[in-house]
């Protein structure tokens, strides 16, 4: 699924805290990286992968759109700054359906629920619907998006929903 839709992120807007009226740039590139190491990997590598990986998006931030945000983002990518990793990027994606992954973030270890009645029964436990992200037994529960998937952009945020922290820029980028 990821291989089919990732390139559709290109040219979509980036904003502050998912506020569509605070556009600060656009996505310029898309690819994949290993989960945990962030090593760039090719599209062919992920097609049959059974372990987590990242969708890696490159963006241009317009300093002229919001100079204070651009400066905060520069500080957030600088490992020497006290503000390091305070700002992260969070996907904005529309989708027509989802299944549930229960018990683990790793799909190879999760129980996948596709039955509509079971999904409806567990829906209120999802964080997206006000739940705590756990089943009655305390198992973690996640949405596994399916159907038609529509990349909409990125929200730069201090509180990402996904297991991500910070953004990356080459050292020469955060020195300017």
What are these regions (language model features)?
Residues 1-176:
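Signature of dsDNA virion morphogenesis modules
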């Amino acid at each position: 699924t990821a291989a089919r839709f990732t390139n559709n992120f290109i040219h979509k807007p980036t904003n502050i805290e998912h506020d569509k009226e605070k556009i600060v740039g656009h996505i310029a590139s898309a690819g994949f990286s290993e989960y945990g190491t962030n090593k760039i990997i090719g599209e062919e590598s992920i097609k049959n992968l059974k372990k987590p990986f990242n969708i890696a998006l490159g963006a241009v931030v317009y300093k002229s759109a919001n100079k204070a945000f651009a400066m905060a983002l520069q500080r957030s990518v600088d490992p020497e700054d006290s503000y390091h990793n305070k700002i992260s990027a969070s996907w904005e994606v529309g989708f027509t359906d989802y299944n549930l992954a229960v018990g683990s973030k790793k799909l190879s270890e999760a129980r996948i629920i596709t039955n509509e009645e079971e999904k409806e029964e567990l829906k209120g436990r999802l964080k997206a619907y006000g739940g705590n992200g756990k089943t009655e037994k305390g198992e973690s529960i996640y949405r596994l998006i399916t159907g038609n998937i529509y990349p909409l952009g990125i929200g730069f945020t201090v509180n990402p929903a996904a297991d991500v922290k910070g953004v990356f820029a080459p050292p020469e980028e955060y020195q300017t």
